[in-house]
Amino acid sequence: MAPTKGKPSTKGKSAKLGAKSSAKSKSSASKPEGISKNRQKKLTLAKPGGAQKTKSRTKDGRKKKRVYSEKELDIPLLNGIVPAGIAKPKGEKKGKIFVDDPASMMAIMSVVNAEKEGRIESKITRARQLEEIREAKRVEAEGRRDEKDKAFEERKEGLKKKRRRSAPAKGGDDDDEGKAKKSKKDGKYKARKRVSFG
C-alpha cells in the first residue's frame, strides 16, 4: 500500500477529540444530565444516604378537611319506624335480647325446647322402629338360609342313598344291559350322529 499524507493530521484530530470527550466525562460526573440547575443545587445540598420527604399539600396550601359520615356524627333518623326487637342499643350486639320481661322469655324458651325435645324423641322412636325392622329382616334371612341348607343336605343324603342302592344292583344286571345295547343296535333306535369340531 502507498503511504497517505493524511495520517499525521488524523492523529492530531483524534487527540483533540480525546481531550474533548475526557472533559465531557468530567463535567457529566459532577452534573447529572436531564436535571434542572435548581434541582442540581438541592441534590448537592441534601444529606447523603437519605431520600428527601416532601409534605403533600393541596393547591391552596391548606390541609384537607375530613368529611364525616352520618353514622359517625350520630345524627338521628327522621320519619323512621324501628321495631323494638330490631333497635340496637349502643355498645350491645344486635338481636341478642328481644324480650324485656325475663319470665315471658323463659316461657317462650320452654315452648321452643319442648318442641325440639319432641322432635328428638320422635327421631329416637323412629330409629328404634327401623332397628327392630332391620333385626326382623335379618332373623328372617337367617331362617331362609337355614332352610336352604337343610334342603341341600337332605338332597345330598337322598342322592347318596340312591347310589348305595343302585351299586349292588348294577353288579348283577350285566346281562340285562347287554340285551338293551343289542336291541338299540338292531335298528329300533337310530344311532345319534356325532360331529367333532377340531
From Swiss-Prot:
Residues 127-157 have a biased composition (Basic and acidic residues). GO terms for biological process: intracellular mRNA localization; mRNA transport; ribosomal large subunit biogenesis. InterPro entries: Loc1. Residues 15-31 have a biased composition (Low complexity). One of its GO terms (cellular component) is preribosome, large subunit precursor. It is found in: Nucleus, Nucleolus. It comes from the Eukaryota. Residues 54-66, 158-167, 181-198 have a biased composition (Basic residues). Residues 115-135 form a coiled coil. Required for efficient assembly and nuclear export of the 60S ribosomal subunit. Component of the 66S pre-ribosomal particle. This is 60S ribosomal subunit assembly/export protein LOC1. It comes from Phaeosphaeria nodorum (strain SN15 / ATCC MYA-4574 / FGSC 10173) (Glume blotch fungus). The gene is LOC1.
